[in-house]
């Protein structure tokens, strides 16, 4: 499964540096005008926040490429916690994420993960309504913008089933 997930699920956004990537992401998100934007990962979340991109749900674990890092999302008052072990999607984390996605009164929100958040992008794609944007980092390459629809969900289910 990890090999399949190393390839971008959506549109790979690249640039000379992280700021250029973030500016491109911001433009794409504004053009699409999605009902929900979910950012997965500390670095992507911090860059989108720094560039004032309207993100509804940030999913973070306090680490960037497995190294403890503190990011500044202090202005987000709605912070929720869940446990998710590395390489898994725990039922409790998936349920909390599902609740956040379907509760706009809780936005903007940070879902702080004790463990690892990487695979929760899959849970976001499976839970989110059509046209939701899920953004996650693609280390050393840029960021990936996924526009959720039934085809993307089916692809994720197939990857999970094949394990």
Locate predicted features:
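N-terminal, charge-rich interaction modules
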Residues: 1-80, 84-85
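Gly/Ser/Thr-rich loops at beta-strand to alpha-helix junctions
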Residues: 38-46, 114-121, 140-141
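Short, solvent-exposed amphipathic alpha-helical segments in soluble enzyme
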Residues: 49-57, 73-74, 125-130, 149-153, ...
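Short hydrophobic/aromatic-enriched beta-strand-loop microsegments
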Residues: 55-62, 130-138
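Internal catalytic-core helix/loop-beta-alpha segment
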Residues: 79-119
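Hydrophobic/aromatic-rich, well-ordered segments within soluble, folded domains that form packed cores
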Residues: 109-136
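Short, flexible loop segments at boundaries between secondary-structure elements
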Residues: 138-152
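Helix-rich interaction surfaces within compact, conserved domain-sized segments
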Residues: 144, 155-162
